[in-house]
Amino acid sequence: MNLNTKYHGCIEYEEKDVIYFEKGIPGFEELKKFIIFPVEDNDVFSVFHSIEKEDMGIIVISPFNIEKDYEIQLEEEQRKKLELQNEKDALVLNTVTLNSDIDKITVNLRAPIIINIKEKIGEQIIINSDKYKVKHPLFKEEA
């Protein structure tokens, strides 16, 4: 299948690549089906893209590229919803807010996207802790 995206051209994908979000994601609750593909010529960023809306793609990054000790505790209800039997089946991604000023690019570490890569279901959750910021700077200033 092909997805003609507004910003990334034509992306080829298969039905098995589609990840289902029962509640959508905050701000886009009506969108339930997404795919993930790498940003061209970049090993760090990926695109989390709706297959239902050609101009709805979000840049995402693994939190472990930013915070080596990033840790979340899923509640039992969340584990059940995601059908997670094993934490190795969980893919954790965080949304990136781009800016033309590289120092103002931020990552939302407070609301990770959790995906069961085996079952292809996902949910964006909110961590009830001040440990992580909604607007964590992608690039820390050197001391």
Swiss-Prot record:
Pfam families: FliW
InterPro entries: Flagellar_assembly_factor_FliW, Flagellar_assmbl_FliW_dom_sf
GO CC term (a single one): cytoplasm
BP-aspect Gene Ontology terms: bacterial-type flagellum assembly; regulation of translation
Gene3D superfamilies associated with the record: BH3618-like
Keywords, alphabetical: Bacterial flagellum biogenesis, Chaperone, Cytoplasm, Translation regulation
Biological function: Acts as an anti-CsrA protein, binds CsrA and prevents it from repressing translation of its target genes, one of which is flagellin. Binds to flagellin and participates in the assembly of the flagellum.
Subunit structure: Interacts with translational regulator CsrA and flagellin(s).
Protein name stated in the entry: Flagellar assembly factor FliW
Protein species of origin: Clostridium botulinum (strain Okra / Type B1)
Source species taxonomy: Bacteria, Bacillati, Bacillota, Clostridia, Eubacteriales
Gene: fliW
